[in-house]
Amino acid sequence: MGKYYLAVDIGASSGRHILGHLENGKIELEEIYRFENGMDHKDGKLLWNVDRLFGEILNGMKKCKEQGKIPVSMAIDTWAVDYVLLDEKDRILGDTYGYRDHRTDGMDAEVAKILPETELYAKTGIQKQIFNTIYQLMAEKQKEPELLQRAETLLMLPDYFGFRLTGNKLSEYTNGSTTQLVNPTTFQWDTDLIRKLGYPEDIFLLLQMPGTKVGQLLPEIQKEVGFNLEVVLCGSHDTASAVMAVPQTEGDGIYISSGTWSLMGIESLKPIINEEAAVANFTNEGGYDHRFRFLKNIMGLWMIQSVRHEYKDAYSFAQLCDMAEESKNFPSRVDVNDPSFLSPDNMVEAIKKYCQKTGQPVPESVGELASVVYRSLAQSYGETVSSLEKIAGRTYDGIHIIGGGSNAAYLNQLTADATGKTVYAGPGEATAIGNLLAQMIYAEELTDLKSARQCVRDSFEIKTFVPAK
């Protein structure tokens, strides 16, 4: 039996601890622990309970001990853009806001007063999203300036959890890149930009690459979980880890990291920053080994998850797909990236209102709603492919769908049909796998990214969906 590695993969709706090891050149996975996640509604704010999340991280580690499977290392990935501010005693200042909170409303205009959006894109190559850290910090500066003044350190959430485990503060690059405050040429914070915006530059720690050691567990953590290990940086932005696990050795093709969000793009050795990319709202996020994830953020399965929730989770996703197929001729489509779908009080009403506003038939049944969502998502993928190929100046043969959404066979087929390209679906646990790959390369069990991706290809089933003739 090979050495165990622990991936702690925390998404916006759930978290999981997955143990991985190599056996006969293949990666074996075992889910050890899973827990629910979600933003808390408190006094009209959407917040993360980081103490609860840290407790869940420890709970999963204890499960490893209970099962007698002690990992040699662990790494943590989460969603992007959210952070904590720490004071001089390393206590959290203020609330830990979630990216769907409305405090950033109007903050793009405030940032644009200091730096026009075209200049900001030229500097960072990052897609404008109202929840990006740059806008969250502007909200902080405008509404609670004393917190920024008192802050000693800014840590993105996975870095904060790493600090709680080891006592060492490190800032990881891939997640840092999503803040819209990083220079894509230097792979470090853009101090000129930070100064211009009036943010305190000394709170930003030097960015470190995936594959960097964070440290050993603190003595009190060792005592609580019953063992020691090394904490290592993976691509701590979950999409960076997921893209690492695309089972294509050259990394040369279109991918969709499909989950609550759909991140659709290509891997590039250089950032693609030009007017066309800016207008199409593509982003250049940091990836493993100094690569760039040139991609577009698409609303993803959030809409269907929300619709299901409105119906009290009475239907499984498989049932929703069947009902959508029964209503496949329902003609209405929505722009899945419309801001009205980001954080509505009621997703079903938001979809109906959009159809009404755009003069389309209003969906009434669950099947009609599901059909609108799935087909609109596939249509968005088709438009994104056209845009991507135009900007990249080339065509691509296939699309790799990774992550939880790769299990949605119905959507995979719609995607093949909408794009006219063969879809390769899997692995579903791409984020955890990418997290593990970074640790295995660090431990020299795998040599590099190319061999790691070949290992993914050899280890997991990939399903194929061909466009309908």
Feature locations, PLM:
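Short alpha-helix plus adjacent loop in nuclease-associated cores
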Residues: 97, 101-114
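Active-site core segments that coordinate phosphate-bearing ligands/cofactors
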Residues: 6-7, 19, 112-124, 138-151, ...
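Short, basic and Ser/Thr-rich N-terminal targeting/leader segments
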Residues: 11-13, 72, 77-79, 133, ...
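Short beta-strand-loop/turn "lid" adjacent to the catalytic site in phosphate-handling enzymes
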Residues: 62, 66-99, 127-131, 162-183, ...
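N-terminal glycine/serine-rich phosphate-binding loop of ATP-dependent small-molecule kinases
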Residues: 1-94, 122, 222-231, 419-421, ...
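Short glycine-rich phosphate-binding loop at a beta-alpha junction
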Residues: 70-78, 153, 206, 394-403
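Short acidic-aromatic active-site loops that bind/stabilize oxyanions
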Residues: 46-54, 126, 130, 207-211, ...
